[in-house]
Amino acid sequence: VCSSLKSDPITSEIPVIFITAKSDTKDEAYGLFLGACDYITKPISPPIVQGRVRTHLNLHDQNRSLQDAVKERTEELHNTQLKIVQCLGRAAEFRDNETGFHVIRMSHYARLIAEAYSDNKSWCDLLFNAAPMHDVGKIGIPDSILLKPGALDADEWEQMQHHAEYGATIIGNDPNPLLQLSRIVALAHHEKWDGSGYPSGLKGEDIPIEGRIVAIADVFDALTSARPYKEAWPTEKAIALIKDNAGSHFDPELVELFLQQIPQVLEIKSQYPDD
């Protein structure tokens, strides 16, 4: 009975006290091994039994309170980490003459693609929260390059490309799943399906799936958003470019999934306008 109680998640935390005529220490050890919290041999004294029951119930309540407190603090820590990631992502966008809505929109677009690709909700949510960090490395790019209104020359473009590696360095190698995925996104979202991207020239499925997803979301939102140096593209023109670059810049399978989500994409775009 004790083994059954302890093996069921619903009843596993119920304190079990053995009351038995078996007084051998081996029997007592076996009862405790099975999960009992106490072992009382007969003859018994009702006041003593009642006292020990109260003690174990109090200990059980205290353990439950501690578990709840740990869970609450863990959630608070997770929320704090999430807020820091979001703030860093927005900070990078503001340095680049972009609004904070860019990271919000493209994060939603990325989650739409992820949800069409996989039914793993935890992974989709994690990607949604990691996506704002895609351009955090721009913090390390000089203003003379980052804010230049015209085209970059060859040297400036080479330096701009380092922002992917800067982003990975800023995020670091922390084992936290959110930061790990943020690092992947920062490092891989400028890789291209045909291997012509940067920083590593990865090709095809060698590019992490998260980087391939964010690449589509980022480019689409950048094209359809107005900037000091360019007008916003019409949605149809941006969609056509994404289509035309399937198999070269973008993963063709993910492009198809993105195109299937266009109605939801347009809803998100209207929900978070720059103006």
Model-derived segments and spans:
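Alpha4-beta5-alpha5 switch/output surface of CheY-like receiver
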Residues: V1, D24-E28, S45, I141, ...
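Alpha4 helix (beta4-alpha4-beta5 surface) of REC/receiver domains from two-component response regulators
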Residues: S3, S7, S12-E13, S23-D38
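Amphipathic alpha-helical coiled-coil "transmission" helices that mediate dimerization
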Residues: G51, N58-Q86, R90, F94-N97, ...
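Metal-dependent catalytic cores of enzymes that make or break cyclic nucleotides
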Residues: L82, G89, E93-D275
